[in-house]
């Protein structure tokens, strides 16, 4: 029976594994709900079953896919389960090839073993089963036996790599092809198994011997294709539903189940394979490529109809799977895929191959024993030939009659089955009734014996005591009788069946002779052989008739013996039914009792006679009466003795009759034994005759089989020659067609050459060549595009893995923060920012996943296009030698141009490498120089600190010397204070901007002494200075007396040794300067300022710039130390203040750094902004006391600042320098020596006033009135009560402005 069906395909989607989840992989496969449909990107595939990821659960794979194959295996069909997919997709886990004896892991193979042996237990009564297993692997295109016990044991090291010497010790197995076209393995081990545990042990042993290894994608990757084969042979036992075939031969089925676990396809770049692993991967991919080509060839319906070539011989794997793919097998393919988007390309290729496999059609047939199958085919052929013969004889109604007979036969077979079932039921009922009849017979015999005992006068106690012995004897006789009856019935049935068989054989002579006398048209060429067959057949029939007559004669004798045996057994049964043995015992006991009673009575009579004789004969009445009593009693006893004698005689007569019956029974038993022995001898003779006839018949059948085999061989040769002839005809026809096509093509080419001869003369590049070149350009562009897409695919994969790690890290930080396991540091991201980052990364991951799937789809389509159009398909348009030369020249030009460009790029790269190397060397040098400068800076800072401490001591000595001169100067200045206080606000503002360094000449060490001298003046001018003080309260002074006393003045030292006596505000342009009058230059010992003085050399300016840079460095160092003590709120406030100041001023005022880290604005000389010079001889009032600190909140408003025309980047103030503290407000009085020339700037009056006042208009608004009017008790008190013209001078105003 042949059935055609397609290969069934199931897709198993495994879940994402831990490494894929860590890399941020997502599912790229979606399963349609309640449909076996899979979506990946823009592709949709439909299969028979889909498991995992929304489909059926994976545990249902066996029930849906493999269980029907096990049913087919027991029906005689070959079956195959094939697991296909990329490495790491779960093929070995699905198949269960890594079986270790534990069934909890599941898998196809363990379930198959359990199901097979469960079915074996249910069918062992009707069939004899023989199960064999084999386990092979295909490693490096060589077939090895995993169950070979002769080869050395395979040892594995810790990493799972097989040792080389053990791998070489195994001998490869050769593949052979049978005469019928099947594939066999020469020398493979086929172990016979009888239990599931035994089969599991072979599977586990082979799994341990299988080649495995570790790669980047799978720690235990299968490095070979494994095939576990289960061979099942079954023969029906007599009494089963299908015991024998119609000709009396046994029906033997032999089927195989192949369980294939393929090695996964892999890419060397992703697996990281090298060396031996790389070679193994090459062989694996080679075998899978051949398998894919076979699937493509079998799945293409057009090629299948045309009878195209299927490349089975390209690989040993495809040769072994030749029957499974397109052959005699029922096949299920399980495509194992990974849902990770990084594996989207391999997953798409696997799904495409699985979709093609659904189009493969297999033709599975029942695999019977060759001899039985041949007899079945011959019988079918005979029936067909008989039907055709009847049809060709002209009897058209015979065919219809045959169909009617076939229908009747089917009905009779159905009726036969029903009757057979009814017979089974009746047989069960008959056994039940026979058992009941047996019990009834035993009970009946028991009752008969009890009745006889009662009739014989036995008491109930005696009957019950003897009942057990009687029951055993009765059961023994009844069972013996039933056995004899069963044997007799069996002999009768055998006799009847033998008679029917002989009669059937005699009836079969006619049809056989008819079949011989009317050979079919197909055998007309072998008439002479058929005549010999007819004579042999007639001789065989005569011999068989003779044997049948002899058998009938022996059967008649056996029937007579059975009849006599029945009669004797019936008579024996009558004897046994009487219970003679029981009666004998009963009567013997009765006789013995009577004899005992007789002797007792005789003794009593003798005693009575003796007593009677001893009685005296006197006349007494007593003696007479006693004598009469004795006489009467004596008579009674004598009467009893006579009765007993009669009974004894009767019993003796019965005993004699019983002895006669016993002798008759013994004689009857002897006759029965003699008849049985004759029967046995006759049966042995019948059996011997049957054996002789069977041996003769077997020899004749063997000769017939040999002749038929030779006839089949001749017929096969004839068919082979006919097929060869037909094939040659087809080849000849194809060659003729090809020749005609080539001739036609040649004519077309000649016509094209004649038509294009003029074009080739005008130029080599014709339209056809241009089209070819464009096609080549297109192919190259496609290749480059594929390379770009693959590179981008790999880059996206790496980038996605990095983002996944970052998301995992951020989530872990969230969890730790929630659990309060870590503390929040300054550099830790806020929770909102972290959540936003996670959300953004997740969106990027989703976008990356869709991009990866799209690129994988493009790469898969490119590979498919390369497979279809690559090779010869790419050059189909090249039809002439000229086109080939043009294409080769064009390709040569492309290759040479690409090579030249590559060389140019290499040269550019080398130049860039040299440049990068030089830059790296410079970076190293500058880094070392920076470290050297930092060391020098630290040394200079240390020196400056030492010099500062020395200058403090020197300034203290100088202050003591100049105390007397300062008192006189203060007295002169106090007389002029009232005059200067009458000036207007604008004049005060101008005086404040006139000379920023006038207050530097004041010595803070003497302020405590000057306070007492100027008390009277301050009291007089308190009212007049109130308005001026309130207006100037915005300029916050936070400089303490103690801090001012620590800052020495370098100009004080210079004034003692000055050449000229010019003031610091003087520019030394007139002849009043002694240095200019003597035609000399001012020097560092002069009293004039280095910034204002125009009579100084460039060297001095350079020295001043050097000193200024040193001061800046010192200020930066101190500023860095101060910044560490300031809080976060001051930094924010300072940054906003800096923004406000930059928006308020067109040009940013230059600032200068003090030694202690404070900053102050550099003031421009009044001569540069158009104001008149203030009076140089104006007395300087005493400084204010320490001002109270106030908080200033600056709001950045106003238009954006204009870019400054010139700004020194190293003088830009820090953001935290706007809020001035008392610690940072100290300014050395010699800071004028480090100032550079200011840039001329014309500003409006209001802006000049704001800038000169330190831009503290907002502070003036928010300042505390009480804080601005008075300071601390230890500081110098400056009155703000009014505008007294004599209380404050322009120098004082300027000093206050500078300190802000």
Curated annotation (Swiss-Prot):
Disruption phenotype: No visible phenotype. PROSITE patterns: KINESIN_MOTOR_1, KINESIN_MOTOR_2. InterPro entries: Kinesin-like_fam, Kinesin_motor_CS, Kinesin_motor_dom, Kinesin_motor_dom_sf, P-loop_NTPase. ATP binds at residues 85-92. Residues 6-360 form the Kinesin motor domain. Residues 956-971, 1001-1013, 1289-1300 have a biased composition (Basic and acidic residues). Gene3D superfamilies: Kinesin motor domain. Kinesin-like motor protein involved in the control of the oriented deposition of cellulose microfibrils. PANTHER family: CHROMOSOME-ASSOCIATED KINESIN KIF4A-RELATED, KINESIN-LIKE PROTEIN KIN-4C. Belongs to the TRAFAC class myosin-kinesin ATPase superfamily. Kinesin family. KIN-4 subfamily. This is Kinesin-like protein KIN-4C. The gene is KIN4C.
